[in-house]
Amino acid sequence: MDATPYTTSSTSTALDSPSSLSATMARRWARKLERYCCTCVTYFPLAFVYSMTSWAAYVDVSLSTTPSRVTWLGHSYGFIAVVLYLLANWCYTYAVFTSPGSTTNEYGYSTLPTQAPPTATSFTVKSNGEFRFCKKCQARKPDRAHHCSTCRRCVLKMDHHCPWLATCVGLRNHKAFLLFLIYTSVFCWVSFAGSASWVWEEIMSNTTYVETLMPVNYIMLSVISGIIGIVLSAFCGWHIYLASRGQTTIECLEKTRYLSPLRESMQRTYVNQHTPGQGIALPKYGQQLLDIHQNTIPGVTRPEEGEEMRRMTTPSGSSQRNDLASQHNPELQAGSRRFTYDEMEHIRARKRYEDYLDEQDSTKLPHAFDLGTPRNLLHLFGTNAWLWPFPVCTTIGDGWSWEPNPKWIEARDRIAREREEQRQRERQAGWGPADDDDITPVYTPTWTPPNQQHPQGGAGRHYLQPSSQPQTQRNSNSSSPSFTPSRRTPSKADRILGRDPNMYADDEPVIYGKHDVAMSRLSPAGRTLVVEDDVLNDDDDDDEDYFQDAGRKQEDAEQSALNVVTNGRWGRPAGASGVGLLAHGRPGGARSPISPISPPARGFGGSAKNGEEGRSNDDGVD
């Protein structure tokens, strides 16, 4: 009875020991410190942008109030710099703290829907041909939407994840982001022009500022604003070009998977880095920094979360026959290392061929959502021209339904027709892939012995089922077996191209025992040529038939004459005269094909066996 309280007290003492409490508190403080560090790293770009722009505005204002030999550096210069600074920071703040738009409701069930759900268009699908669905968000992804692993949500019309904004650039903040790039680029060039002009004039005139080490802020502003202006202007110009074409950064860079193996190599590198035992293992902090940059453009620099990764070892086509073959053959399943040489060559050849077709098609297809420069810019900036310079969301559309490019639809239909015509030509040539929907059943005649033709089923009436072949063919094939040609062994080229070696157009297929194509020699005018060998062979056959018919007629005439003379008993061995044997000429009543009369000496040597055989022919005769 005393053991239980003692055990409880000892357990509580062990749990409340100073060492366990200190360890628990240490882990809690470590997790808090880690969260604070991550928050600081996340919002450090914001602090950097605000501080840099504020410092540049301060230097510009001080430069405009300082006496200088540059005449245009006055109060107007300071006013322009301050206006650009305010507009740039306004756009930056709006782009950072405005949601880019998501496919899911951020408020859950706290609010009831006030409008009908939008109708989503689906011009783009996954690599396997299915509708785009995000497994992370458990929601359907419309066109131009992608899942961001950093923001942990699907973003409508996602352009990219900007680390300098600590958020994604999407449908609702794309306009503010583009205005921020424009205002910041102009602000950098204005600051560079003012600070560089002031520094140049002071150095060339050799004024007192050179002797007293002129203000360092002016020199730093000229260098920093020049460098940032060059880089940011190029970036801004590229985004303006994409906006005029109606493209996003992801849509522009996604074409690299057709034009070069860049996308495949990046995905393979990402898989190796995140798979134990493959690739070069990076330190944890190094891998986190690398993931930050790879998360910028999901689907291009890394596999997009929420979607199945494309298989690297199997062809990326949407053929159902390949999927069924991989299910039935474990050697062809993804991740298996049991590949034969022929299978690997076949897979690589198909992959190269499909990549080549995709590359050719990508060069022919225009952008699916390019409606022209005016309409693309109106979609981004809105119809109200007074609100274009300000970071107010005036973008047209809800991000779910998109109007396609008519040229893209026309090109897509044309390429689809060309692909179908190519497949038809390949099938007609005999080496193209077979179409499961267009397979026509071919009747192969087989011979069945008469004693094995039993009706199926039990007792009762059984009716003859109608046959699909003509009556003449049924009669001709009912008593003679059909000839089945031997199948050829597929060659290496046949296995690579996926064709059947027994389906060539220049072969002679046998159907119902006859060739479906008459193989004869033709003249240039299209007439049939007569070959001398064929004529000679035909003459020999005719002579043979003639002699056989003549001998048969003579034999029939002699038989009729003997029947008249012997009163129909020329083949009987009755009596002692042995007339039947004399007439027959050989034992057993076998006739000679040349002459029915043989020497009499052979007739008197008959045996009992011959008599029995002859006696069997005398049934029913008195």
Curated annotation (Swiss-Prot):
Q: Spell out which residues lie on the membrane's Cytoplasmic side.
A: 1-38, 98-175, 239-622
Q: Where is the composition biased (Low complexity)?
A: 466-488
> What's a GO cellular component annotated to this UniProt protein?
endoplasmic reticulum
Keyword Manganese, does the record have it? Answer: no
Membrane spanning stretches: 39-59, 77-97, 176-196, 218-238
Checking Pfam families in the record gives: DHHC
- Record keywords, A-Z: Acyltransferase, Lipoprotein, Membrane, Palmitate, Transferase, Transmembrane, Transmembrane helix, Vacuole
| InterPro entries to which the protein is assigned, alphabetical | Palmitoyltrfase_DHHC, PFA4/ZDH16/20/ERF2-like
Compositional bias, Acidic residues, is annotated for 533-547
Which residues belong to any copy of the DHHC domain? 132-182
Q: How is it modified after translation?
A: Autopalmitoylated.
Topology check: give the Vacuolar ranges. Answer: 60-76, 197-217
Q: What does this protein do?
A: Palmitoyltransferase specific for vac8. Palmitoylates vac8 at one or more of its N-terminal cysteine residues, which is required for its proper membrane localization.
PANTHER family per the UniProt record, alphabetical: PALMITOYLTRANSFERASE ZDHHC16
Protein name as catalogued: Palmitoyltransferase pfa3
